[in-house]
């Protein structure tokens, strides 16, 4: 099972069995509606400093089901850090816990290299709050940053949204850990 170790100051620690530091994490977790079970346990997406993107799924109890990996070019890392630099005026002051005014059917967590992780409950409700409210302000900024990251991944065939993840097999092929991958014509490695 993959584990993230959070270090003081919000920095990512190493992930067990990988040896590379994650620089971005997004986790989606649907909650059970009253009187019913959640359909599934959601998913986690991790981008590592070596350009590997990991997509993991979970069952309704939150237990790990499967993991697929994708190789992204170095340009993705450069663009990602450019997005973080652009967010540096507001991201450090973002509360670690954002909640909408109504109970949510799902929760999300966002983590960016060098910043404390942010848990969001009811992103859609928060986006509807007035711009002058703290929740509305930070939710909008966080959502725009997330959309920018999604657009960056989409350039290489990865389609990610708040509640979904898919890929174009015509543009990118997943692999499993311990399989050989090719990240560039001159680089080869094993995850």
For each feature predicted by the language model, list its residue ranges.
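Acidic/histidine-rich, surface-exposed loop or edge segments in extracytoplasmic proteins
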Residues: 55-68
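Short, internal acidic amphipathic alpha-helical interface segments
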Residues: 71-109
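Short, exposed beta-strand/loop patches in secreted or surface proteins that constitute
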Residues: 15, 45-48, 69-71, 110-112
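Short, well-ordered, aromatic-rich surface patches in folded extracellular/luminal domains
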Residues: 1-37, 94-191
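Generic detection of short hydrophobic beta-strand segments and adjacent strand-loop junctions
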Residues: 68-72, 118-121
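Generic short beta-strand segments
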Residues: 27-31, 55, 86-88
